[in-house]
Amino acid sequence: MENEERGLAVRNATMVTSDIFGESKAKRLTSLDLRDEEQVDMFLNAQNDADFKLNDCAGKTLTIIGATIGEYPNETTNEETGEVIIRKKHSLCLFDEDGKSYVTGSGTCYYSFASIVALKGMPTKDAPLKLEVVKVPAEVKGHEYLKVKIAK
C-alpha cells in the first residue's frame, strides 16, 4: 500500500527550503514577499532570533502582515518495544505591521492559525489579519494552550 501525502492549498503562500542537497523532510511555507528585500530580511532575522515569544503576548491583538509555518519530523523510540515513532512537530512565526516577529512551537497555536488561513488565506501587507493571542485552559489543571483567533 502506498502512502499518499495530502496538503492544504493556501493562497498567498510560497514554499521555502534551505536544504541545498534535498534530503531534509522539513517543510516551510511563508506569505512574506521574498522578492522584497525588507521582507527577506524579516524572514532571515526571525529564523535566527525572533523578537518575541508568542506565549508572552497572550491578551494582545496583533496586525499580522506575514507568517512562516514549518513542519518537521520528530523521531522518538518506544523504550519498551524499540519501535521508532515519527511525529510531526510544527513552528509558527508571525510578522506584524512594524516588522516584529513572534514565534511559537505550540502545536495547538499552529493548528488554530492553520484553521484561520485555510479560509482566509495567509496574511500579507495587502491583506493583513488582525489576530488575538489567547490562552485557553486545558483539561489538565494548571495547564493552558496557546491559540490565535480573529480579533473583533
Predicted regions mapped to residue ranges:
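OB-fold ssDNA-binding interfaces and closely related basic DNA-contact patches used
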Residues: M1-G99, K141-H143, I150-K152
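A composition-driven signal for long, intrinsically disordered, charge-rich low-complexity tracts
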Residues: K25, S106-T108, P128
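Short nucleic-acid-contacting surface segments enriched for D/E, G, S/T with interspersed K/R
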Residues: C57, S112-E132
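GIY-YIG-like beta-to-alpha core
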Residues: Y102-S115
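Short, charged beta-turn/beta-strand-edge "cap" motif at the junction between a beta-strand
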Residues: P123-K125, E132-K152
